[in-house]
Amino acid sequence: LKEKNPSLIIGLTGCITEKDKKKFKDKVDLIFDIKELPELEMKIKKLIKNNIEISCKIYSKQNKKNQDDDINYFHIEPKYSNKNIGYLPIMTGCNNFCSYCIVPYTRGPEISRPVKEILQEIKNLIKKKYKKIFLLGQNVNSYQSKLNNEIFDFPKLLKLINQIPGNFKINFLTSHPKDMSDELINVMAKSEKIKKELHLPIQSGDNE
């Protein structure tokens, strides 16, 4: 791509390790953490204006991720191309450290959004006529947050969502077997607005 169009700006993001950042640093113009999305426009403008390489953030084990980064990431308003399906991040990060997965190292520990914030965003999507809403998280069924000094886990959150008036269905991904429970399965079975579908990583169910 660069050979055909030298002025083309190539950016790299996602679950990128420190090793990957060093490996690709000389091959792309911009490397940024997914939680730096609010700064992306500024970085691209700076890159175009100054024609300089923008240094990427490299997190070491000594550097803690700022929780404000996650809050800013949650508040990025998505632009939907599909008028029927809405996507709603409710948590980020993972605490499981499965042997095959890099997510805990690249996305950090689990952080969940406030209950009221999630419910309000779902209501906004319903007002915009979205019929299917996906709740998103690296380990979505480990969701846990406080509301009025009460701990709300994922089954309790689904119960609240099911009570919201409107013609819509809720899906969620990605789940982890460790956080599956009889309560969650019962809530899915009894809630008319929760789709009877379950997304699980196959690797995490293999003890071998």
Predicted segments, located by residue:
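Conserved SAM/AdoMet-binding glycine-rich loop
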Residues: G11, K19, I126-E208
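Proteins enriched for Cys/Gly/acidic motifs involved in redox and nucleic-acid/cofactor modification
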Residues: L1-Y143
